[in-house]
Each structure stands twice: as structure tokens, then as C-alpha cells.
């Protein structure tokens, strides 16, 4: 039997023991009361009673517990913009903790939703991890989605804050995100309290006073924020289906 087959068989035959051992490799603020709660099928709950933070396990533990702060955590290599950026764990945590502080200053708390409408750039990862750092629930929507599709997801997720890029860049063209976002908010019944806009040098956007906040300015006035422990059964993100066969369905992912 190969190592893969052995691991697969064990996960299949002894799932609770298998995942209990796997859970030992991540950081817990409080250990779970039991591995799997089967009391309300088909709504099973993993590691009830435990508290955890996804951002801590993605970043902080590599620095504080393993001493890997100077190791590479993220490489951004864009053939479209010809930009190459590298972030160590320590550098990425600095970016994330400051943006978490900016979101907190805008009122984002544990359990709030943050919708992210951005291209595939480092700041998208920063926004995701910053939301998780606060115990907020993020939802990434494909950058450049048409306004009606974006509006549907805004109404479903009801975000307190939307984080968006001013534009996306594809071979031979620039797609302005901000007009799409503005139209989507007009179409949606739910209105976010604030929109944080990352102004990209290729195409800056016009900000709406009182609602829109410049990413750079928000971070410049923010203080770094620590991780917020949340229940292992609390959501960490919502990922929507394509909606090609009907209304998009939000898939909720628990923290553990």
C-alpha cells in the first residue's frame, strides 16, 4: 500500500481520529470539547467548543512560533503588468495587521461581512487575511463581474464594507471596476456603510465623499490589529457559485 493509500484509508475508516491528529498541527486559543458533533445530522459540527483564528495560523504562527518571519510567504509575478513583488511572513503580517486596523476603524467587527471585489493582486490576499484577523467573514467576488451579478451578491452577503480595486488589467485593456461597483450598489437593496478603494496607478477612480475611503489613506492612519479568536464553527468566508443555473448560492466555510 502506498503512503497516499494508507492516509486515504485512515481518513475514511477513522475520520475523527484522523482529523483530531491533523488539528494538533494548528494553533488553538482553546481546545475543542469534542472532534465531531453528530447530534443534528446532516448538520455536523467539527471541533465545537474550540477557538481559533485563520489569519494567525496563516501568518503569525510562522513568525511567533516557528521563527520563519524572514521566509517568503507570497510571490506576486504578473505577466500583464510586468510587476514582481515578494513578501516575507513578517512583511505580509505588517500589511495585514495594518489593514485589519483600518477595517476595524471603519467599524468592522467579528461576524461582519466584508465583500472583496478586486483583481488577483497582493492586496486581495491582504484584505482576505485582514478580515479573518478580525473574525469578520469575507467574500471574494470575481473582479470585473457585471454590476447585476455583483448586486446579487451584495444583497445576499449584506457586507458592512466593500473593498475594491479601481481597475483590473487584462492583456491590451484596462477594466474600470469602480463604475461597475457604483452601479451594483445602486441596484442592490443593501447598501454598505463604506467602500475601501485601492487606487491603482493604471486607472484611478473617482471617490464618493462620505462613502468611499482611499486604501492608502486608511492604512496610513491605522494601528496594527491583533488576531481575534473565534469559534471553530464560526464562518471564515462565503464563496458563491457561478449562478449560471439560477441564483448564486453562498457556500459557507467554517474556521475549522
PLM features per residue range, with description:
Residues 133-217:
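Structural core segment of the AMP-binding/adenylate-forming
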Residues 16, 97-101, 155, 246:
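Solvent-exposed alpha-helix faces
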Residues 70-72, 195-198, 208-240, 247, ...:
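Conserved pre-ATP/AMP-binding loop-to-beta segment of ANL
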Residues 114, 131, 235, 241-244:
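Conserved S/T- and glycine-rich ATP-binding loop of Class I adenylate-forming
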Residues 77, 119, 165-167, 198-200, ...:
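Cofactor-binding loop segments of dinucleotide-utilizing enzymes, especially the Rossmann-like FAD-
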Residues 1-86, 91-94, 98, 185, ...:
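N-lobe entry segment of adenylate-forming
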Residues 55, 74-129, 146, 150, ...:
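Conserved AMP-binding/adenylate-forming core of the ANL superfamily
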Amino acid at each position: 500500500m502506498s503512503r497516499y493509500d494508507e492516509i486515504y484509508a485512515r481518513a475514511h475508516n477513522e475520520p475523527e481520529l484522523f482529523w483530531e491528529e491533523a488539528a494538533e498541527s494548528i494553533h488553538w486559543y482553546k481546545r475543542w470539547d469534542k472532534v465531531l458533533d453528530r447530534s443534528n445530522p446532516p448538520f455536523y459540527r467539527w471541533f465545537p467548543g474550540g477557538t481559533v483564528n485563520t489569519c494567525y495560523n496563516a501568518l503569525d504562527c510562522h513568525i511567533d512560533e516557528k521563527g520563519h518571519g524572514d521566509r517568503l510567504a507570497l510571490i506576486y509575478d504578473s505577466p500583464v503588468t510586468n510587476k514582481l513583488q515578494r513578501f516575507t511572513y513578517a512583511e505580509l503580517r505588517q500589511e495585514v495587521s495594518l489593514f485589519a486596523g483600518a477595517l476595524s476603524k471603519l467599524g468592522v467587527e467579528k461576524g461582519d461581512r466584508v465583500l472583496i471585489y478586486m483583481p488577483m493582486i497582493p492586496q486581495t490576499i491582504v484584505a482576505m487575511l485582514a478580515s479573518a484577523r478580525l473574525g469578520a467573514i469575507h467574500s471574494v467576488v470575481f473582479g470585473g463581474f457585471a454590476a447585476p451579478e455583483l448586486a446579487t451578491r451584495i444583497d445576499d452577503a449584506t457586507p458592512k464594507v466593500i473593498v475594491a480595486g479601481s481597475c483590473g488589467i487584462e492583456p491590451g485593456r484596462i477594466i474600470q471596476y469602480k463604475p461597475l461597483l457604483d452601479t451594483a450598489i445602486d441596484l442592490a437593496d443593501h447598501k454598505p456603510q463604506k467602500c475601501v478603494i485601492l487606487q491603482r496607478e493604471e486607472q484611478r477612480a473617482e471617490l464618493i465623499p462620505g462613502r468611499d475611503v482611499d486604501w492608502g489613506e486608511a492604512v496610513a492612519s491605522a494601528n496594527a490589529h491583533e488576531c481575534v479568536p473565534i469559534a471553530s464553527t464560526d464562518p471564515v468566508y462565503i464563496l458563491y457559485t457561478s449562478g449560471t443555473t439560477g441564483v448564486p448560492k453562498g457556500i459557507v466555510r467554517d474556521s475549522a
